[in-house]
UniProtKB/Swiss-Prot annotation:
Keywords: Cytoplasm, Heme biosynthesis, Iron, Lyase, Metal-binding, Porphyrin biosynthesis. It comes from Photobacterium profundum (strain SS9). It catalyses: heme b + 2 H(+) = protoporphyrin IX + Fe(2+). This is Ferrochelatase. Pathway: Porphyrin-containing compound metabolism; protoheme biosynthesis; protoheme from protoporphyrin-IX: step 1/1. Belongs to the ferrochelatase family. InterPro entries: Ferrochelatase (IPR001015), Ferrochelatase_AS (IPR019772), Ferrochelatase_C (IPR033644), Ferrochelatase_N (IPR033659). GO terms for molecular function: ferrochelatase activity; metal ion binding. Catalyzes the ferrous insertion into protoporphyrin IX. GO terms for biological process: heme biosynthetic process. It is an enzyme of class 4 (lyase). GO terms for cellular component: cytoplasm. Its EC number is 4.98.1.1. Fe cation binds at H193, E274.
Amino acid sequence: MKNNNYGVLLVNLGTPDEASPAAIKRFLSEFLHDKRVVDMTRWLWCPILHGVILPIRSPKVAKLYQSVWMEDGSPLMVYSQRQRQALEKQLNVPVALGMTYGTPSIATGLAELKQQGCNKVLVLPLYPQYSGTTTAAVFDRIAKELKQQPHIPELRFINHYFDHPDYIDALALSVTDFWAENGEPDYLLCSYHGIPKRYADNGDPYPQHCHATTEKLAERLAMPREKMSMSYQSIFGREEWLQPYTEVTIEALAQKGIKRLDVMCPAFSVDCLETLEEIAEQCKETFIKAGGDVFNLIPCLNDNEAHIRMMKNLVTQHSQGW
């Protein structure tokens, strides 16, 4: 019998409902309308978004999604649902899934927990490294939803876990397990989702969190620093983003004589378009063309046992007293 004293809301970014241009357009429109993601003045941004970006990018992105789509849906949704089910089984409390953009929405997740009698909600955004573009966007959505309700639940919000020992251990185990099966590379690159440099200059701690995760992982793996570094991927637009850029770094490593390269994406809690297509396909092609021989993407933590154990411990720690 479940303990319904509190419930857990797992939150990730979201995904299109299907790999069609129309579904991609709906999703990108909601995502790129968020001022946390793109903070340009609306009168300037909206014509660019609706007149240029959505019409051009939606068909292109649809083809990319089609290349990674799984039998049960998008990889992000499939792995997120598996995470929810596994965590609920481990905790024996209600666990709901909500996406910042798309479906199931954060509102749907909160409603599910309410229907199960939860008057206390622990929100776990699955972003290890805090950023205003991701973690804060979750908080905004929750506040907007609860603003409409006369009786709101007691809330606790996990801000980050970039340096949590169980998270670092889970990352390290995923690396050593992968190497046990595939052999060790010449070099390990940690690729994080990028944000505009201006956001960091204005106080977003994301790059500090990414550096700290990389440092702790290197210590945990006992990796010589000349064999490991970090970079930022998924850049779009014309302004400067956090550097070094992943694709530029990968090309440079190959040109320096690195023949076998492994890339992991610690900021992504599940594999998705940005890992399975951008890294595993596009960046692999860049590496091989620049003179590399073997390129591997180390899978994200997804629903592996160490990751679910980390989530369980994180929730248990933050729900003390409930």
